[in-house]
């Protein structure tokens, strides 16, 4: 893990702690710069990767979800959205921030948070397909909206997949997501 400090004239400096680099893999660290109002650093801390960090276990869900007759929304077909809303915490955490994230960028982020870029190409492809399928299930069933929430998915491993704000993105994972963009398991 590395710390990245970014300074540019006319912008507030930013420090990103926890940026990951893997041997033999190219990565891109996104940094959001704000127009300068003061000189203080904006600190961003990227938590541990899910393969070695401590995160809550997935809460089991029934594979077949019962539908209610009370007007529950389920889309008529699978739609690959342009954006999704990621709730950065547990569904009931009203203090957690919501992020509007391009669907493609969300998939790249989750893949980089949950698998290693050094894995064999076929393993990366299989995991990305599973990540996209799980995400599209949440979109298609309007899972959280039907529970009264205003977001698409959470960043909590207890409920969904790990999404990390400003996560380091690996070039090979990014390329594979772009290649598999419209695929999913049904």
Q: Which stretches of residues belong to each language-model region?
A:
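Conserved, single-site charged/polar hotspot
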Residues: 1-186
């Amino acid at each position: 893990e590395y710390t990245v400090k970014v300074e540019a004239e006319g912008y507030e400096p930013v420090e990103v702690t926890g940026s990951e680099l893997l041997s033999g893999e190219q990565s891109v660290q996104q940094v959001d710069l704000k127009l300068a109002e003061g000189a203080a650093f904006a600190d961003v801390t990227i938590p541990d990767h899910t393969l070695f960090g401590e995160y809550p276990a997935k809460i089991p869900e029934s594979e077949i979800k019962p539908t209610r007759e009370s007007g529950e929304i389920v889309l008529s077909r699978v739609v690959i959205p342009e954006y999704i809303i990621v709730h950065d915490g547990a569904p009931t955490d009203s203090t957690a921030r919501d992020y509007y994230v391009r669907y493609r960028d969300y998939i790249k982020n989750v893949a980089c948070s949950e698998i290693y870029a050094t894995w064999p190409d076929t393993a990366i492809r299989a995991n990305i397909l599973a990540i996209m399928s799980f995400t599209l299930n949440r979109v298609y069933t309007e899972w959280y909206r039907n529970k009264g929430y205003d977001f698409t998915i959470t960043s909590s491993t207890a409920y969904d997949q790990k999404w990390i704000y400003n996560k380091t993105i690996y070039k090979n994972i990014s390329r594979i997501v772009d290649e598999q963009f419209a695929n999913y398991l049904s």
